[in-house]
Curated annotation (Swiss-Prot):
The lineage of its organism: Eukaryota, Metazoa, Chordata, Craniata, Vertebrata. It comes from the Eukaryota. This is Protein KTI12 homolog. The modification Phosphoserine is found at S200. PANTHER family: PTHR12435. Pfam families: KTI12 (PF08433). Belongs to the KTI12 family. One of its GO terms (biological process) is tRNA wobble uridine modification. Keywords: ATP-binding, Nucleotide-binding, Phosphoprotein. ATP binds at G8, L9, P10, Y11, S12, G13, K14, S15. One of its GO terms (molecular function) is ATP binding.
Length: 354
């Protein structure tokens, strides 16, 4: 069944959108399987994205989990950052090999993020690469400033954690001012009510959010592995269930090509004869070269053509060429070539040895 890939930075509402889509599909009686970081790691851990080796292992585990679940019965939803276009292409190839449709849902949060990180331009053009700006908090007297303190009259982001995610408000006063912890929920209550996200067990530090935003490769509908593409800006925009449903269940699956389609298996008799004929040719060649001198034409068993002898040949070299010939012939089986197998192998040896 189809594969739905969710893409976006942390705190963009991906998990909430996944729950919406899963609930809608299950209400229609469809079986839905969700693959996310927590399912693979055992618990959601944001520090994975700060270590390239661990992140690479995570992508491999996510890809393997998706490949195991792809079937004709269940809808598979991948809930992860999926910010690398090369990884999205690998997922596209998995769906193509399974002959099942695929679509991409890109979640963008237009507002501010934790620690002062802001994504600009997402509202104007959600399909382009977003720009990122972030400024760490300054220190005064060797100690970090309190949350919400202004520096030299410049507004400083006030971060708070509401429902285990970060929100931000920018005070308008130019005077340094302390914001009490008791007042923080009131500053962001209205925003949190509008954009409450699915609870996440991971907290992304500002430095990690900035790094993820800088290396984020936004989806582009011009790429075949990024379409059909559905871009959702903010949590207020409704999920396009009708369009997603049409992309998953009404569109044709991408056709397989040579890299994703299994090669036809050769019959047992063909493989047996191929192995037998090539072995006889090698045995005859090793025996004939014992009394041959360079320039002689060697007549080998089962062949009507001759092989010009130029130098002594080792069994290791001939065995390597035999394996290459067998691998190529198995992918291009043709029963009409059975009588010519010995001559074909002799021609292959003649071209490879000179």
């Amino acid at each position: 069944m189809p594969l739905v890939v969710f893409c976006g930075l942390p705190y963009s509402g991906k998990s909430r959108r996944v729950e919406e889509l899963r609930a809608a599909l299950e209400a229609e009686g469809r079986a839905v399987q969700v693959v996310d970081d927590a399912a693979v790691l055992g618990a959601e851990d944001a520090t994975v994205y700060g270590d390239s080796a661990r992140e690479k292992a995570l992508r491999g585990a996510l890809r393997a989990a998706v490949e195991r679940l792809l079937s004709r019965q269940d809808v598979v939803i991948l809930d992860s950052l999926n910010y690398i276009k090369g990884f999205r292409y690998e997922l596209y190839c998995l769906a193509r090999a399974a002959r099942t449709p695929i679509c991409l849902v890109y979640c963008v949060r237009p507002g501010s993020l934790s620690g002062g990180l802001r994504v600009a331009g997402a509202v104007d053009n959600p399909n382009r690469n977003v720009s990122v700006s972030w400024r760490p908090r300054a220190e005064e007297g060797g100690r970090p400033l309190a949350v919400g303190t202004d520096v030299l009259g410049e507004p400083q982001a006030v971060a708070s954690l509401v429902n285990r995610r970060a929100q931000a408000e920018v005070p308008t006063e130019s005077e340094p001012k302390e914001i009490r912890a008791a007042d923080l929920p009131a500053l962001v209550a209205s925003e949190s009510e509008k954009s409450a996200e699915h609870a996440s067990g991971a907290f992304y530090p500002p430095e990690l959010l900035e790094a993820l935003a800088l290396r984020f490769e936004a989806p582009d509908s011009r790429n075949r592995w990024d379409r059909p593409l559905f871009t959702l800006v903010g949590l207020e925009e409704p999920l396009p269930l009708a369009e997603i449903r049409a992309a998953l269940f009404e569109n044709r699956a991408p056709p397989p090509h040579q890299s994703t389609q299994s090669q036809p298996l050769a019959s047992g008799s063909f493989l047996h004869q191929l192995d037998q004929v090539t072995s006889q040719v090698l045995a005859g060649l090793m025996e004939a070269q014992k009394s041959a001198v360079p320039g002689d034409l060697l007549k080998l068993p089962g062949t009507t053509e001759h092989l010009r002898f130029t130098r002594p040949l080792t069994m290791a070299e001939l065995s390597r060429l035999r394996r290459q010939f067998i691998s190529y012939t198995k992918m291009h089986t043709n029963n009409e070539n059975l009588p010519q197998l010995a001559n074909m192998f002799l021609q292959y040896l003649s071209q490879s040895l000179h």
